[in-house]
């Protein structure tokens, strides 16, 4: 093993999916997985195979298609979880089972209701059983950063003796600050030595996930876990793009340490994940935020124009952020379209390619200029599509005075159903029509409109979160030049997601 290489462990498809509204289907996860492979990620946590049949299928499909990356599944320290992980990962060329159990006093007492000795025994049995499926086993001490050091050492020793090759020390609740994690990881690294790779997994509850990850690397950790765009539960995970670019940019601090990440794939990966999940990075997000390379101040603008390095410590080109150039038009053919998709990181089967191309030609008839972001949005809409129980065939809308009206026709069970409604605004009227036609009442929890590219004829992307029949809220996404049609598509998309999850 190269002791200077930092192993990049991406958990966007597992921990990142736990962001509210970020649920992904198998086709979406597969597209992200293939892009993570192009990015140069070392280990990809493809999911939690035991969580549901959908998760099992996603892990299994990724295991079949990934080739130059280690595919990993999370598993609690219970036989059922480990068996599911092992079976889902079976086709993978390189595979890893990541098993875990909580080790902090509060978790052992109140969540597990187990004694420390029982927790150690459970950990050992989990690692040993995992080894029957694959040689590469990672063991995590959940809530390690609130665990007693003496117990951490004891359970890590037991896991290594049982066959674990990686020991992960997560700050599950994002509690520590850099000096604390430096001290803790230094002691663990000194104790473990060369017997296993020490890994860290930091959450961002106090805004220190990236700083803590970098501090842990300096303290001797050689694997770092995180997500693209920093998505994840609560305040999210350590943002891998920040960690990678910090190591690359500050070689005066980190040399001879390095990662195998292909930095020009960072921005395409970020955009793909944002398009699929509907979760946009905050505008001032480091590395991938839309303002990351924007300069408003006149003094800054003057400096950048004279010499970029006056105010830019990394270049936009180094992360693959090229000018959002005009790319294709209505006379472009299928081959040119396919080549453009490949350059943007998409790998579609022939059926999906044909459908995406039809949408592109339709857009080209309506929109004078088509940009990379338009293409990304079109394809993301196609690969995120689920079975359509309800499908819009026509929409008429009007507004003026105190109320707006909407008339809509929707295909359901091979029949066209039409209805109308009034509302406090056009979007409200549209949502009421959908409720009337479907007979399923929804409560709008969130509504967001984004311009995909530039110009007066820019595509509108609408993301909604809707709670149907008092059940868990689901997300819907819509794309159209007409903002209200995009809103209708998003709401109907949420309805279809609800039916797929709760009715089937």
Curated annotation (Swiss-Prot):
Compartments where found: Cytoplasm
Ligand binding (Mn(2+)): 15, 201, 203, 237
Residue numbers spanned by region Regulatory domain: 391-504
UniProt-listed CDD domains: DRE_TIM_IPMS (cd07940)
Cofactor(s) this protein requires: Mn(2+)
A Gene Ontology BP annotation from the UniProt entry: L-leucine biosynthetic process
Major location (coarse): cytoplasm
Keyword hit for Membrane: no
InterPro entries: 2-IPM_HCS-like (IPR050073), 2-isopropylmalate_synth_dimer (IPR013709), AIPM/Hcit_synth_CS (IPR002034), Aldolase_TIM (IPR013785), LeuA/HCS_post-cat (IPR054691), LeuA_allosteric_dom_sf (IPR036230), LeuA_bact_synth (IPR005671), PYR_CT (IPR000891)
GO molecular-function terms, A-Z: 2-isopropylmalate synthase activity; acetyl-CoA C-acetyltransferase activity; manganese ion binding
UniProt keyword annotations, A-Z: Amino-acid biosynthesis, Branched-chain amino acid biosynthesis, Cytoplasm, Leucine biosynthesis, Manganese, Metal-binding, Transferase
Catalyzed reactions per annotation: 3-methyl-2-oxobutanoate + acetyl-CoA + H2O = (2S)-2-isopropylmalate + CoA + H(+)
Entry keyword annotation includes Manganese: yes
Function as written in the Swiss-Prot or TrEMBL entry: Catalyzes the condensation of the acetyl group of acetyl-CoA with 3-methyl-2-oxobutanoate (2-ketoisovalerate) to form 3-carboxy-3-hydroxy-4-methylpentanoate (2-isopropylmalate).
Family in the record: Belongs to the alpha-IPM synthase/homocitrate synthase family. LeuA type 1 subfamily.
Entry protein name: 2-isopropylmalate synthase
Species in which this protein is naturally found: Campylobacter concisus (strain 13826)
């Amino acid at each position: 093993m190269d002791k200077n290489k930092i192993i990049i462990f991406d958990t966007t498809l597992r921990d990142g999916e736990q962001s509210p509204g970020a649920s992904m289907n198998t086709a979406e996860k597969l597209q992200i997985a293939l892009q993570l492979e192009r990015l140069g990620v070392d280990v990809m946590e493809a999911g939690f195979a035991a969580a549901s049949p959908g998760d099992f299928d996603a892990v299994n499909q990724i295991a079949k298609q990934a080739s130059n990356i280690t595919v990993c599944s999370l598993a609690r320290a219970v036989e059922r979880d480990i068996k599911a992980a092992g079976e889902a990962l079976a086709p993978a060329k390189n595979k890893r089972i990541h098993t875990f159990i909580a080790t902090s006093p509060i978790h052992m007492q109140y969540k597990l209701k187990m004694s420390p000795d029982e927790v150690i025994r459970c950990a050992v049995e989990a690692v040993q059983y995992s080894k029957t499926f694959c040689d590469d086993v990672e063991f995590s001490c959940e809530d390690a950063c609130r665990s007693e050091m003496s117990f951490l050492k004891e359970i890590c020793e037991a896991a290594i003796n049982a066959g674990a090759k990686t020991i992960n020390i997560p700050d599950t609740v994002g509690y520590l600050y850099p000096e604390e994690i430096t001290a803790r990881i230094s002691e663990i690294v000194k104790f473990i030595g060369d017997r296993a790779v020490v890994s860290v997994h930091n959450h961002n509850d106090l805004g220190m996930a990236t700083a803590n990850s970098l501090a842990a690397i300096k303290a001797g950790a050689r694997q770092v876990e995180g997500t693209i765009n920093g998505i994840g539960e609560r305040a999210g995970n350590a943002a891998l793009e920040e960690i990678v670019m910090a190591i690359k940019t500050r070689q005066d601090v980190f040399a001879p340490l390095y990662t195998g990440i292909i930095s020009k794939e960072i921005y395409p990966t970020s955009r793909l994940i944002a398009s699929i999940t509907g979760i946009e990075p905050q505008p001032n997000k480091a590395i991938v935020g839309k303002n990351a390379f924007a300069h408003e101040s006149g003094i800054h603008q003057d400096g950048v124009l004279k010499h970029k390095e006056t105010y830019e410590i990394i270049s936009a080109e180094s992360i693959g952020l090229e000018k959002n150039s005009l790319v294709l038009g209505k006379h472009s053919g299928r081959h040119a379209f396919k080549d453009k998709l490949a350059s943007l990181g998409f790998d579609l089967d022939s059926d999906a390619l044909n459908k995406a191309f039809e949408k592109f030609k339709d857009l080209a008839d309506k929109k004078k200029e088509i940009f990379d972001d338009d293409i990304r949005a079109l394809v993301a809409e196609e690969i995120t599509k689920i079975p359509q129980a309800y499908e819009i065939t026509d929409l008429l809308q009007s507004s003026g005075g105190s109320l707006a009206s909407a008339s809509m026709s929707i295909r359901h069970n091979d029949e066209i159903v039409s209805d109308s409604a009034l509302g406090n605004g056009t979007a409200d009227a549209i949502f009421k029509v959908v409720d009337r036609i479907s007979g399923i009442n929804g409560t709008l929890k969130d509504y967001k409109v984004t311009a995909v590219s530039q110009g007066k004829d820019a595509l509108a992307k609408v993301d909604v979160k809707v709670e149907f029949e008092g059940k868990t809220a689901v997300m819907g996404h819509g794309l159209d030049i007409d903002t209200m049609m995009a809103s209708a598509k998003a709401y109907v998309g949420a309805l279809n997601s609800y039916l797929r999850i709760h009715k089937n």
